[in-house]
Amino acid sequence: MNIYKRLGIRTVINGNATLTRLGGSIMPPEVVAAMADASKHFVDIIELQKRVGEEIAKLTHNEAAYVSCGAAAALTLSTAACITGLDATKREKLPLHPSPGRGGFQPSTMKSEVIVHRHGRVGYDFAVRQVGVSFVEIGDENGTPPDELENAITEKTAAIFYFANPSREHLWVPYEQAISIAKKHDVPLIVDAAAQLPPPENLWRFTQMGADLALFSGGKGLHGPQSSGLIVGTKSLIEAIAFNGPPHPFIGRGMKVGKEELVGLLAAVEWYLGQDHEQLQQSYEDQVTYYTEVFKDIQGVTVHRSFPSEAGQPMPRTEIRFDAEELGITRDEILQQLQAGNPVIDIAGTGANGVLINGQTLRPGEVEIIAHRLKEILCSIDC
């Protein structure tokens, strides 16, 4: 029996995105097999982390790499690394707030600020703040002049963070200029690119531009273990990340990465880089064409190509708009009926009357299931 049936859990057809709440992505057999193989033996975790990092660094054309416990943990560990380096005394003082018996925060010796774009903030930046740093925001709705970034840098600046999203980047200091400013002041620049795969070139694009670190989710575009993340960048900062990370009893102790996840992410990177990404892109285009054909004769329904995808990735999605007055059913009622079925169908709403279907997370045959279920709902009203 399927484990989810035994537990009474409905499975989900995920036409939404590589969302954590839905399980991220589906691991290919190669990744599952690698994890199962890793589970059969005891190993030295520190040694395994080092070797896996070396292999991933080679695959991704980077100086060094580290496997974290998800992308949020990557944010925390990267911030910690920028503050402590390999200084054990500083490591003991994280997080940066008064703590009896730990020495507390000493502003004269500890960097405590991170620079971010005001219109680049995301809901996950708590993972940076939990180290105890404060954010210095730059820019506004009209953009960010480079000198504003430079003027924000002080002796307290630990790092400059970019939360990558191509749809917002016109409001930010361009990467190349920001990297030049950061290097001038010897401040690390870090790019959180958790969902920015595809394109696969992003695994080395940011660091080749000069970013000190780039962070990715292991369980989104890479199709690795959901509880894994990938950090690539300079050897010195990767060493400082490992210094703060598990199994050491400091700020990263609770962010453990098992031997299965370590080996699984290596297998995922190998698998991902071996895929035909042009063919995958074409398959997403074909889905838009398919839905357009399926719904072309249904009054009150229109289909459009939406681009880019939800986090600015260069992938098309299918946007379907519903005329509630003509159909006699609202978009939200349609979404509720999709959620009520078995399996659940989870797609994103957009605007007042539209939905978006993301092909990145659909398995073979599920495109047709979604189309059939939508037609079934619409035909129950008037067909």
PLM feature spans:
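Conserved PLP-enzyme active-site core in the AAT-like
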Residues: M1-M27, K50-S68, A72-Y272, T292, ...
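Conserved C-terminal alpha-helix-loop-beta "cap" of PLP-dependent enzymes
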Residues: I3, V294-H372
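Generic N-terminal amphipathic, Lys/Arg-enriched alpha-helix
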Residues: T11-R21, E30-S39, M315-I320
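N-terminal alpha-helical segment of soluble enzymes
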Residues: A38-I46
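Conserved PLP-dependent catalytic core of the aminotransferase class-I/II
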Residues: L59, L273-F307
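Phosphate-binding loop/pocket of nucleotide- and phosphate-handling active sites
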Residues: M110, D382-C383
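A common structural junction motif
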Residues: H248-P249, L338-I345, K375-D382
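Glycine-rich phosphate/diphosphate-binding loops and the adjacent beta-loop-alpha structural elements
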Residues: W271-H277, V355-L356, Q360
